[in-house]
């Protein structure tokens, strides 16, 4: 995996600008360069509803991927804040629900994941993405620096992370795509603005083309086959925790309704 290649960050007008890497069927060869990159083709807000409808139409004959897509699309327009303290706390709680340790420190101090804890002095979307990395990584790689994927853009102790890299570039690319989509679906589950990460990570690049929907459908189907999401596109792990969280949120809405 080239240094700096990660889907742990992105860029959208509602977020501070920050490095991003790309996935998707139309990512150019330049995306393999170690320099972090941004959204390939930003979609204007007034065009986004049309783009979402077109993607949904391309997925119409595939119920499971369509259900996952609808969960993400439903987070547009973004009703509340972005990267709020509450959202960061949600990400930390999600990690703890999975038994993942966290450390309130910037990943630039050493590693994003050191084999034991996620460093969580980062944006909420990055915390959730890192939990998804843990879920997507083979159990034997969870004890490795950066999950054996090599150094990410935040990693400062790069030689150590590189020494523990076990995955080829192609394997890293595939796992990053799986992680990206799972993290986005977890953001939707948490009530976070999942659509922003979906755009930042270029899942909507070339949205007019059926191939973009095919790319999404393939990864959604694989997450389902792996037991990481259900037929409705909802993340399948720590279900008791997420059900209780939903019930508590509904109770608050009812009390204030």
Residue ranges and their predicted role:
Residues 106-114, 137-176, 198-203:
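Post-HEXXH active-site segment of zinc metalloproteases
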Residues 173-188:
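An active-site-proximal "capping" alpha-helix that borders the catalytic cofactor pocket
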Residues 125-138:
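Active-site recognition of the HExxH zinc-binding catalytic motif
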Residues 2-19, 23-104, 232-251:
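A metal-dependent hydrolase signature that marks the N-terminal structural subdomain at the beginning
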Residues 34, 38, 195-257:
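Pan-zinc metallopeptidase signature
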Residues 113-126, 169:
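Short pre-active-site segment immediately N-terminal to the catalytic Zn-binding motif
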Residues 100-110, 117-120:
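N-terminal "first-domain core" detector
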Residues 186-198:
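Substrate-binding/catalytic groove segments of enzymes
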């Amino acid at each position: 995996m080239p240094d700096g290649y990660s889907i742990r960050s992105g860029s959208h007008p509602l977020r501070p600008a920050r490095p991003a890497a790309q996935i998707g069927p139309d990512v150019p060869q330049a995306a393999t360069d170690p320099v972090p990159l941004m959204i390939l083709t930003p979609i204007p807000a007034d065009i986004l509803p049309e783009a979402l409808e077109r993607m949904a139409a391309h997925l119409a004959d595939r119920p499971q991927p369509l259900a996952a897509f609808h969960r993400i699309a439903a987070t547009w327009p973004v009703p509340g804040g972005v990267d709020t303290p509450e959202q960061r706390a949600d990400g930390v709680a999600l990690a703890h629900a999975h038994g993942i340790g966290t450390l309130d420190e910037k990943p630039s101090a050493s590693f994003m994941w050191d084999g034991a804890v996620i460093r969580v002095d980062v944006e909420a979307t990055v915390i959730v993405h890192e939990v998804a990395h843990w879920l997507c990584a083979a159990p034997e790689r969870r004890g490795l620096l950066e999950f054996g994927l090599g150094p990410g853009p935040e990693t400062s102790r790069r030689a150590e992370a590189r020494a523990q890299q076990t995955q080829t570039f192609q394997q890293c690319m595939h796992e990053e795509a799986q992680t990206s989509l799972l993290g986005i679906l977890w953001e939707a589950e948490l009530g976070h603005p999942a659509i922003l990460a979906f755009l930042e990570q270029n899942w909507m690049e070339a949205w007019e083309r059926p191939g973009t929907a095919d790319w999404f459908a393939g990864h959604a189907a694989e997450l389902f086959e792996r037991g990481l999401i259900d037929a409705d596109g909802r993340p399948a792990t720590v279900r008791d925790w997420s059900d209780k969280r939903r019930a508590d949120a509904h109770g608050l809405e009812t009390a204030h309704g």
